[in-house]
Amino acid sequence: MTDLVPVYYAFAGVVAALLFYKWQSDPLRAIPTIGPSAPLLSYLGAIRFFKDASGVLQEGYDKYNVFKVAMIDRWAVVVSGAKMNEELRSIPDDQMSFMDAADELVQTKYTIAPDVLIHPIHITVIKEQLTRNLAPLFHEVVKEVEAAMQELIPAKGDDWIEIDGYSTVTQIITRASSRVFVGFPLCQNAEYLRIATTYSAEVMKGAMIMSVLPDFLKHIVGPLLPWSRRALRRAAPFLLPIITERRRLLKEYGRDWEDKPNDLLMWIIEEARRVGREDSTDLMVQGIMASNFTAIHTSSLTFTHALYHLAANPEYIQSLREEIEEVIRTDGWTKVSMGSMWKLDSFLKESHRVNGISGISVMRLALKDVTFSDGTFIPAGTFVAAAATSTHHDEENYSDATVFKPFRFSDMRASESEKNKHHYVSTSAEYIGFGHGKHACPGRFFAANELKIMLASIVLNYDVKFEDEGKRPANVWFATTVLPAPGAKVMFRKRQT
């Protein structure tokens, strides 16, 4: 056995030499690193990033225009500041791809059904039909939000009740979104709603597992992940009978018939027909569930952040009420009139700015070698993103940048030259909560509409506070995801004034 000791040492030396050579020749080595960058030691940096992404990103933002951080399965390059954000988003798609970056981050080929990745018909529908139909569907969303709140926030008289903030918000958003996605009465079916709600968590569970595996194991473990496939199987019995009947009516009557449904599922069926996939009912089910994934998870986090601000600062409720009631009294309660509720819009935009739901945005995957204007070389295959939270907390972009000022953006719009700017859904190099440019979140118009209806409904019907008045529970970072404090309780009572 002792005769083999020199062999072991020689083998270890060869491995060390190979790792050192790979490190020395890595084109990313020239980019400053937050944390250790040497072979093996970089995994310590990845662990730190997982535990303290906020601190790591802020350190890099304060020091460098471009820096890199270690993730378990890759290096991520991060750009700092509005100028670099603008440069990143303007790089052509054939050089840096948003879709490929999203696929990498969520590991979609293992966590999302493959058919809808090849034929993402739901994205076309969300960009076009859903956005065009926000006004006709406005009162459907209002009715579902009001019904859900009466059931889930059953405050009576002058008694305060306590509810779990995030859980309740998620249930309301799932019902309101489902009203638009699949229509009534399925939007109120408890078992279907449970499947729709848990699908997002199951996709993210799979993505987290895949993100810590080396590439050679991903091909083995990925096909074995059960959760999202199981959710699709469970959703199918609810959706397939509706799809079958609507396809029959479409075949019999053509594009129009009396009482034709006006919802996402109908548009997905028609889009599948348009692209020659009219017989692929599995694709239609996958399209609905993929839409649930993008809508429910992100909107629930976003609105819970805003609800926590409202509960911590109930003194702002009266100003919001006065604006909402004045607009309704003058113009009615419609999608168009809601555009006049500047303070409502500003409250949500400011909450999104201060908190966000991710520390990074404007994600891209380099398809070719790219060189930034400052000379930084990005080799093909590199994951690149902008530092979202740090951008939003930058004093060069916003005064008192870390302070929540609910009417910051409505005050900015008071100037004649600014009144058509600073909408919640607007993006810029300084405001990247929805991404920026042509790849900004296509569902943000629907999401903003839904969240404004929810916030207005709460303000008009309830008083809100935390038991520990005036104190907002701290956010929790899970890698780059920014979570509103899990399990935090919010106090509600019927409006008293």
From Swiss-Prot:
Domain of life: Eukaryota
Annotated GO MF terms: heme binding; iron ion binding; monooxygenase activity; oxidoreductase activity, acting on paired donors, with incorporation or reduction of molecular oxygen
Keyword Lipid metabolism: no
An example Gene Ontology biological process: secondary metabolic process
Membrane topology: Single-pass membrane protein
Location of this chain's protein in the cell: Membrane
Enzyme Commission identifier(s): 1.-.-.-
GO CC annotations, alphabetized: membrane
Cofactor: heme
EC class (word): oxidoreductase
Record's keyword terms, sorted: Glycoprotein, Heme, Iron, Membrane, Metal-binding, Monooxygenase, Oxidoreductase, Transmembrane, Transmembrane helix
Binding, heme: C441
Parts of the chain that traverse the membrane: 1-21
UniProt xrefs under InterPro entries: Cyt_P450, Cyt_P450_CS, Cyt_P450_E_grp-I, Cyt_P450_sf
Predominant subcellular localization, coarse grouping: membrane
Its biological purpose: Cytochrome P450 monooxygenase that is able to use dehydroabietic acid and testosterone as substrates for oxidation, suggesting that the natural substrate(s) may be structurally related to steroid compounds.
Family: Belongs to the cytochrome P450 family.
Protein name per UniProt: Cytochrome P450 monooxygenase 151
